[in-house]
C-alpha cells in the first residue's frame, strides 16, 4: 500500500495574477491529490495537499515551477500526517 502524507505548501515569488491557483488545481487533480490552494495577503500562494506521498511530492515539485507566467522564488513545505479530511482539490478564497 502506498504511503499517505499531507503537506502545507507556501510558494513565494511572482505567483499571484499568473493563474497559479487554477494551474495548481489542474495539476493536483491530474495527480489525484486532494486539498486546496489560495492567495495570501503577503503575495504568496498557500496550499494544503494530501494523498499518496509520491503524488504530493510531485505537486510540491510542480509548485517549484508553477505555470509558465509564474516566477517562483521559494517553496516552503511542512509535512504532516494524512488526515483524509480534504475534498477534491479546489481554490479557496
From Swiss-Prot:
Catalyses which reaction(s): an acyl phosphate + H2O = a carboxylate + phosphate + H(+)
Catalytic activity, EC: 3.6.1.7
One Gene Ontology term of the molecular function aspect: acylphosphatase activity
Residues of the signal peptide: none
Active site residues according to the UniProt entry: 21, 39
SUPFAM superfamilies hit by this protein: Acylphosphatase/BLUF domain-like
EC class of the enzyme, as a word: hydrolase
Ranges where the Acylphosphatase-like domain occurs: 6-93
Gene3D superfamilies per record: 3.30.70.100
Cross-referenced Pfam families: Acylphosphatase
InterPro entries reported in the protein's UniProt record: Acylphosphatase, Acylphosphatase-like_dom, Acylphosphatase-like_dom_sf, Acylphosphatase_CS
Swiss-Prot/TrEMBL keywords: Hydrolase
Similarity-based family: Belongs to the acylphosphatase family.
NCBIfam families from the UniProt entry: PRK14441.1
Protein name: Acylphosphatase
Gene behind this protein: acyP
Amino acid at each position: 500500500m502506498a504511503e499517505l502524507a499531507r503537506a502545507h505548501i507556501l510558494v513565494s515569488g511572482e505567483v499571484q495574477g499568473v493563474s497559479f491557483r487554477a494551474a495548481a488545481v489542474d495539476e493536483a487533480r491530474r495527480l489525484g491529490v486532494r486539498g486546496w490552494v489560495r492567495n495570501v495577503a503577503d503575495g504568496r500562494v498557500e496550499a494544503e495537499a494530501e494523498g499518496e506521498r509520491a503524488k504530493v511530492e510531485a505537486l510540491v515539485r510542480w509548485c517549484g515551477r508553477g505555470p509558465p507566467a509564474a516566477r517562483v522564488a521559494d517553496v516552503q513545505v511542512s509535512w504532516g500526517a494524512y488526515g483524509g479530511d480534504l475534498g477534491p482539490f479546489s481554490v479557496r478564497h
